[in-house]
Regions:
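C-terminal/peripheral segments of proteins
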Residues: 1-96, 103, 107-110, 119, ...
């Protein structure tokens, strides 16, 4: 706009922001979702306790929905279970993208090709493990919804997305149900490996086709993250995962893949 009188002239103090301190649940799970649903219900901040003009997010991502479900399932959680949770690669049945997936599977089965694709989507377990046979089509469909929601636009036409996903899957996978790890790869040039995960899964992987490749290449997702624990005797132990930034593409670097 061009009106300076509508520009905010002050700041809310940190104490006015949504906060969670020492929740009884023992966990906080924040994954780009509304700040009013980050732990168990009794510990969540309440919208009526913070400034109404804060511009707080209202969305729930799959990572948020799935993570909260897993925390509820685990109750007490071990280090190994925390690792398992972080690398979970499934979509929640309660994820908002499932509504769009249902629109796609409800399309008319106009020919054998469409019928076969819809059958695979209906039987998909919503997982993105490397051996998964439904992920190539399923992730393609959900990625279209994810891109629309992230960009603030309406969902695309379901039929157009299904047709596009069928074409892409057959072109790079040679069949309707290739193993996800055969078409979803991580690496560079002729050096690459199968990779699990997908857009907005806790094991976050965002892939696209590069320069006419016969596969998808992971271009974003999991980067730097740490697991920190304290032993009974007070010792702190830390396990970190780091991709070394752009240096992994530098042939002179010891981190060059």
């Amino acid at each position: 706009g061009d009106r300076s009188d509508v520009i905010g002239q002050g700041y809310h103090p940190t104490s006015a922001l949504p906060q969670v301190t020492n929740p009884e649940s023992g966990f906080l799970h924040s994954a780009n979702q509304t700040p009013f649903n980050v732990t168990e219900a009794q510990d969540n901040p309440q919208p009526n306790t913070v400034p109404a003009d804060g511009g707080w997010q209202t969305r729930m991502t799959n990572r948020a929905t799935r993570g909260l479900e897993l925390f509820a399932d685990f109750e007490q959680i071990s280090f190994d279970e925390a690792w398992q949770l972080k690398h979970d690669n499934s979509y929640s049945v309660n994820y908002r993208g499932m509504t769009f997936l249902s629109e796609v599977t409800a399309l008319p089965r106009s020919d054998d090709t469409v019928s076969r694709a819809i059958e695979i989507l209906e039987n998909w377990d919503r997982g993105t493990d490397k051996d998964n046979r439904g992920a190539a089509l399923g992730v393609c469909v959900l990625a279209a919804e994810w891109q629309a929601e992230s960009g603030g636009t309406s969902n695309p036409d379901a039929q157009a997305i299904l047709d596009n996903c069928i074409d892409q899957t057959l072109e790079i996978g040679g069949r309707f149900d290739p193993r996800w790890g055969d078409v979803n790869r991580h690496g560079r040039d002729d050096t690459h490996w199968p990779v699990a995960g997908g857009p907005d899964t806790l094991r976050a992987i965002y892939s696209r086709r590069l320069d006419g490749d016969d596969h998808l290449t992971a271009v974003a997702g999991d980067g730097l993250y740490y697991f920190i624990r304290w032993t009974p005797d007070g010792e702190q132990k830390l396990l970190g995962t780091h991709q070394y930034g752009n240096d992994m593409t530098n042939p002179e670097s010891p981190h060059y893949l």
